[in-house]
Each structure stands twice: as structure tokens, then as C-alpha cells.
Amino acid sequence: PDYQAALREFARVLRPDGCLLLTAPFLFEAPHTLIRARLQADGSIQHLEPPVYHGDPINGEGVLCFQEFGWDLCDAMRTAGFRHVEVISAWAPNFGYYGSFQVFFIARR
């Protein structure tokens, strides 16, 4: 749920010049990340938007989507310690990328 802490940890554990390849729910048209839900101190979940669940091969019920990222994710990655961030999109059935374009964030420490 704390994606900024996760980004800092990615940057911390990567070697200098290490590279992070990240996929995450992303809204092309959104300049800012949409926070859909928050984890409370008591472990409960506060829903700020109607719950959305994404596919999970382990749990048939899916995984709760806590946020859908906007373009500000690039700034958050830089703030976390990445010096270069780029975004690419792909659609390639032969590699299993179906449906809408898959977005990849590539961040170098």
C-alpha cells in the first residue's frame, strides 16, 4: 500500500546503475495517481473509490487495487533515488501481452 516506501526500497537494494522494470496499474490520461484505498493502522482498509480487483493466479478472488498510477509516478521514482526513468508500452500476443497496451516503467539507479 505504501508505494513510495516500495520505490525507496527498490532504489536502496539495486546496485549503482541497477535497473528496475516495473509494471503497475496505470492511467495514461491521468497526471496524478488515483488512490483507491488505504491501509489503516489497525489493519482495516479504507476505500476511497469503489473496490477494483485485479487478476491473481494464486487467489481467484483477485488482488485489491490500492492505486492506479498517473504520470506523477515518474517523479515519485526520481524522488525515491532513480536518476533516469522512462515509460514504454507494448502489445505483443506472442509474449503474452494481451488486451490494452501493457505499460513498463524502466528506472535506473
Give names to the regions the model predicted.
Residues 2-109:
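S-adenosyl-L-methionine-dependent methyltransferase catalytic module, highlighting the catalytic core
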